[in-house]
Amino acid sequence: MRKIIFKGNLLTKYKGKKNIRLVLEKRIKSEENLWYWDSHYAIDEMARTNRTKMSLAAGCTSAVSPLTKWDDNIEMAEQKIVTGHCKHTDAFNKKADAVLVSGGSDDVIWDILNGNKIQNFYMNLMYPNDKRYVTVDRHAISIVLGRTATKKENSLTDKQYEFFADCYREVA
């Protein structure tokens, strides 16, 4: 699919990929673009410190990630692992609870997370080099659009998610 009607506006892959490349060029110049590797090691350290499997720590982190800044996300996930509680919505707390008692297989955690963004975020945290998984969050949406996404635009159908993810895959 080369184009999509997104929230009433035509969006082409050409424009989306162009916007991704503009941001990527700026990031490459300013840093080494290793965010997921840094995050992978942070999750691994959290897991070791709290004597749990990395997959459980990554799954819990992913479960409580929606609408959360990264520093708060890590803190909430660790709080959840240590105390069984964190400040997030009931739905995401329940997902984190289910992850933490799941045994830690990727397939089971994937099914528990059951949402494009948090499933892909989990896989990116676990396997930073695997290009099959793309976390399309509000920041990624804004980059493709070339502007800050509205609250309405931050909610994606499965078809829209794949369109945005494909834009990133084709640039990578």
Model regions and ranges:
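HhH-family (HhH-GPD) DNA N-glycosylase catalytic core used in base-excision repair
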Residues: 1-172
